[in-house]
């Protein structure tokens, strides 16, 4: 019995790839290798399933979790391959697969004695690949071609007698991209010197072209080091700002405590003043009442010392006493 062939699913659309990259940018502290140190596997699995749900919400066919992970792995492999080509070009070597073997021609130089060799094709990253490059923490150098056409310069008769033929071309503007935090790509542009006029003959040996490539590589490395220093400086500035904000919060808290202590001190001072006023009023009242108490005491003592008064005889006769006293 023949086994039915497995039906191949549709390729990932741009929207699906955009959702995968967007979710990984949001969850890079959970899923990207150089960010997720110490993250448990359960949290990673939950994050991947969340990405799968978002992808299936816009996909035309249902995706599985291994497919999404495989797509992310393919995207990383493609970006790293291009970054390796750029680094090889910067360090003086040729990117794999970028030129054909036709003499010893390099970027901007001719190969062989018959004429100019093929130029190295610039490695360009799409905006999506630049975002992936930022997630991977790769610093890339991308040579963008100039809008002006490349004009070869005619050589003089003295140069034709040299061991190798040199064709000077206009060096395109080189733009250097660097990876910064929070998915930001910053670039610094090194402008090339103005091209020589086509009619001016140049007497130059082949080794001069090799020496002219080294300053470009040196400039690129200096730009990379400068970008790293700028990134470290920005991180340091962020830490300093956080420390300054923390100190400001502590200062505000200390000021609130000091104000509350001042309010408590004012309340205690007012309470002490009120107590002093009460004591003064009581002392004045005692001084006023003391003479009155003395007078009242004397009055009581004088009434106690006087004898009782004698009864009236007329009143006794009228009350039924003998009339002999009246007669």
Swiss-Prot record:
GO terms for cellular component: mitochondrion; nucleus. Residues 1-70 are annotated as: Required for nuclear localization and apoptosis-inducing activity. It is found in: Nucleus. Residues 87-118, 303-327 are annotated as: Disordered. InterPro entries: Myb_DNA-bind_5. It holds the Pfam family Myb_DNA-bind_5. Residues 104-118 have a biased composition (Gly residues). Induces apoptosis. PANTHER family: AGAP001331-PA-RELATED, NUCLEAR APOPTOSIS-INDUCING FACTOR 1. This is Nuclear apoptosis-inducing factor 1.
